[in-house]
């Protein structure tokens, strides 16, 4: 990589808008996007979330963080002596975890390469995190390939992490350090970690679906006269009794049968939201410990069944030791 030629191409681009023919197409495209976003090359640091905002981001990315932590900790042991840091972001480019060499982590604070920093291209220009998010594929950005001059003191390699079922871009795993740490192996390591995380996420989802199905089967035995539909925390249909899908489609227009919007809705808001869309139904929220597993939508079979008394409702609930929170409406 000819750092001097890249620096000269960057200077010509930011000074006169000359097409950067001597740089990689991924970098040239990102520079142009950064210019379109009106990013100043003199920007000193990325914006940073407040503590409350960072808390919400971490809560929203709980599945990602939980599955990432073991893989990140193993990789961080390697990077601890390599003057590099390992970074996890959410799907919006907010840094939610940092591990690795302590000095490198401390140096990262100068440009807000830290927990809460936002590294999308529209916030801080070309960088491995933001460009991987924009392109949806792994990318390595070295030194003068960064759009903002102060960030050119870094070399970074990032790989996106996708949800194994609906392929939503969940976040990015990034390896960053000073330019002297540049290695093509950094990108390979980032890709490997991202792949391992996707496997772990898939296993976690299967486990959650299994626990949701255990609850579904219990309700199916107790409410034999009702039709039941099980949906996971992202609004995906996991299982349904024979007539439940027909009733579900009858209640909703074709466009409304996509419940994926629920993934971004606070869990305790689900019953109210779903009751407005589907009359004469109830929603049972299913949690186990701190895991929000999903919900069971209960459709009456034939005439509407009478609302159970408080005593009967308690009998219908699972034991607190197995399901710590349910909400029947």
Task: Annotate the PLM regions.
Residues 199-262, 315-329:
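Signal-transducing coiled-coil/dimerization helices and immediately adjacent hinge/linker segments
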Residues 47-58, 313-325:
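Conserved adenine-nucleotide phosphate-binding loops and their immediately adjacent elements
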Residues 144-145, 154-159, 261-315:
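PAS-family sensory/regulatory modules and their coupling/dimerization elements
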Residues 66-72, 112-141, 194, 245-285:
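A charged amphipathic helix-loop-strand protein-protein interaction module that recurs
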Residues 148-150:
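An active-site-proximal beta-strand-loop segment
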Residues 1-123, 130-140, 153, 162-165, ...:
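Intrinsically disordered, low-complexity terminal regulatory regions
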Residues 62, 230, 246, 285-288:
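C-terminal, active-site-flanking charged/polar segments
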């Amino acid at each position: 990589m000819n750092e001097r030629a890249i620096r000269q191409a960057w200077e010509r681009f930011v000074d006169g808008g000359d097409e950067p023919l001597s740089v990689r197409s991924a970098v040239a495209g990102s520079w142009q996007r950064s210019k379109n976003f009106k990013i100043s090359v003199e920007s000193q640091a990325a914006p940073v979330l407040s503590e409350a905002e960072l808390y919400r981001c971490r809560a929203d990315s709980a599945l990602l963080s939980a599955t990432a932590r073991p893989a990140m900790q193993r990789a961080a042991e390697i990077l601890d002596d390599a003057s590099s840091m390992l970074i996890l972001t959410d799907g919006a480019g907010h840094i939610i975890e940092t591990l690795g060499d302590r000095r490198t982590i401390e140096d990262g604070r100068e440009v807000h390469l830290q927990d809460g920093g936002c590294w999308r291209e529209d916030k801080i220009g070309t960088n491995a995190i933001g460009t991987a998010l924009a392109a949806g594929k792994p990318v390595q950005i070295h030194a003068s390939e960064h759009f903002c001059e102060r960030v050119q003191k870094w070399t970074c390699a990032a790989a996106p992490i996708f949800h194994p079922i609906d392929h939503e871009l969940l976040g990015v795993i990034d390896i960053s350090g000073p330019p002297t740490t540049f290695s093509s192996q950094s990108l390979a390591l980032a890709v490997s970690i991202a792949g391992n995380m996707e496997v772990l996420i898939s296993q976690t989802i299967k486990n959650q679906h299994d626990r949701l199905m255990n609850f579904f089967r219990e309700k199916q035995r107790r409410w034999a006269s009702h039709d039941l539909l099980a949906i996971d925390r992202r609004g995906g249909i996991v299982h349904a009794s024979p007539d439940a899908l027909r009733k579900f489609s009858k209640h909703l227009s074709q466009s409304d049968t996509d419940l994926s919007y629920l993934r971004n809705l606070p869990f305790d808001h689900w019953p109210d939201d779903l009751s407005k869309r589907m009359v004469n139904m109830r929603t049972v929220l299913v949690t186990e410990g701190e895991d929000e597993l999903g919900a069971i939508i209960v459709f009456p079979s034939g005439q509407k069944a009478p609302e159970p008394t408080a005593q009967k409702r308690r009998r219908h609930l699972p034991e607190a030791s197995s399901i710590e929170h349910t909400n029947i409406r």
